[in-house]
Every structure is written in structure tokens, then in C-alpha cells.
Regions:
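N-terminal lobe of the biotin/lipoate ligase/transferase fold
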Residues: 1-149, 182, 199-200
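Short glycine/serine/proline-enriched coil/turn segments at secondary-structure junctions
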Residues: 84, 158-160
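Short conserved catalytic/interaction loops centered on acidic-Pro-aromatic/His motifs
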Residues: 126-131, 162-163, 175-179, 220-221
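C-terminal accessory segment of soluble enzyme catalytic cores
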Residues: 138, 155, 173-221
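Glycine-rich, charged/polar anion/phosphate-binding loops
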Residues: 149-156
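Conserved phosphate/anionic-ligand binding catalytic regions in large, soluble enzymes, centered on
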Residues: 160-169
């Protein structure tokens, strides 16, 4: 059984603390044979940049004073990947799962999350795909117009996961211009709104993403 939680608009620091506590709790329960709950958490964050454990600080193009001027924060975090942006109009999804319940390794799990987002895009008539050597979901792959619509970065310990994905829905894409997103200098960023040229209902996107992740996990369990 998987519990779905919607944390609404929540500061990155509070969400990080809450998901870390749930992550540690699940690992402890798993290792000690106690009952536990698999969770998928949805939320949005105020303007924030997160830099993965192997990320390069040079991919943040603003100094602390400039960050303050655009009302954004910067956090170094314990996930894979480089730097990315989170903000209003973007769904962040944090699955806190015991992957062994779903017979998944980490690589297969990331592939599953990508597949769910690809299928969400398809429901809006948008063709999305993966890029070899890069995580996340992309549009116009293999062309000069290649652009990213969903970033991913996960931490795993004892096959328990935290962190997850960030899907741009009605995101203010200007905030990506202050970084080299995910460490890429020559690739663009997009959103459902930018592709469809109209605002997209946030709840509708979350419902579709939730349904597709659950369907794909059910197939593997």
C-alpha cells in the first residue's frame, strides 16, 4: 500500500526535514522488521535552488546578494545530480519507498519515474523522451532545440528512496537563466505551459502524474 500526501506550498528546508525523517523512519523499520508505510509526496516550493552532492558551485551564476534580490534560497543537498530550480507552478514529487517491495533497482526506479512523466506529457499531446547519459525528461531530443521539462535526483540507502522529480507545469522559466540547469550549459528548459501556450491546471497534472506512477509501480510489485 502507498500513501499519497500533498504538502502544498512548503519551504524547502521544512520539506527536507520532513522527508528526511520519513526516510530514516522507513529504513529503521525495514532493518528492524517493523511495519512501515511507502509514501509519495507532492508539493511546491517557494523559489529555491538545490545543488546535488556532486554538483559544481560554478553552475550557480548569482552571488548571495543577487539571490536575495530575486527572493530565492540555495541549498546543498544529498541527492544525485547537479543544480536545479524549484518554485511555484512546478510539481515536486518525493517518493519515499522501499524499492524491494516493487522489485526495483535504483536504475529501474529512475526509468519508471521518467516513464510516468513521459506519459503525462503524452496526455497533453507533447512528445517527450530520455536523453542518453542524462536523467530526467526532455523534448526535441537530439535536435538543437533539445529542452528539459522534468529534472530528477534521488538518494537511496538500503533500497529506500528520497528526493525525486520536479515537473515544470506553469513554472516561471526565467529562474533557470540564473543557473546552468543540471550542469548543462547548452540545453534549454521548458514547461507544459510554454509548450501548450496556456496555463495548465496544477491539480489535473498532479492527478495524472500520481495515477501513472501508481500504475507503473503496481506493474512491478
Amino acid at each position: 500500500m502507498i500513501t499519497i500526501e500533498n504538502w502544498g506550498l512548503i519551504s524547502y528546508s521544512e520539506a527536507w526535514e520532513r522527508q528526511t525523517a520519513l526516510f530514516d523512519e522507513l529504513i529503521d523499520a525495514k532493518l528492524n522488521g517493523k511495519p512501515y508505510t511507502n509514501r509519495i509526496i507532492f508539493c511546491q516550493h517557494p523559489h529555491v535552488y538545490t545543488l546535488g552532492k556532486h554538483g559544481k558551485a560554478a553552475n550557480m551564476l548569482l552571488n548571495p546578494k543577487q539571490l536575495q534580490a530575486i527572493h530565492a534560497e540555495l541549498f546543498q543537498v544529498d541527492r544525485g545530480g547537479d543544480i536545479t530550480y524549484h518554485g511555484p507552478g512546478q510539481w515536486v514529487c518525493y517518493p519515499i519507498l522501499n524499492l524491494e517491495d516493487f522489485h526495483l533497482g535504483l536504475k529501474e526506479y529512475l526509468h519508471l519515474l521518467e516513464e510516468a512523466v513521459i506519459r503525462v506529457c503524452q496526455t497533453y499531446g507533447i512528445e517527450a523522451d530520455r536523453v542518453h547519459g542524462a536523467t530526467g525528461v526532455w523534448l526535441a531530443t537530439g535536435t538543437p532545440g533539445e529542452r528539459k521539462i522534468c529534472a530528477m535526483g534521488v538518494r537511496s540507502s538500503h533500497f529506500v528512496t528520497m528526493h525525486g522529480l520536479a515537473l515544470n507545469v506553469n513554472t516561471d522559466l526565467r529562474y533557470f537563466s540564473y543557473i546552468h540547469p543540471c550542469g548543462f550549459i547548452d540545453k534549454g528548459v521548458t514547461s507544459l505551459q510554454a509548450e501548450l501556450r496556456q496555463e495548465v491546471p496544477m491539480d489535473e497534472v498532479r492527478d495524472r502524474l500520481e495515477q501513472l506512477i501508481l500504475e507503473l509501480l503496481k506493474e512491478t510489485a
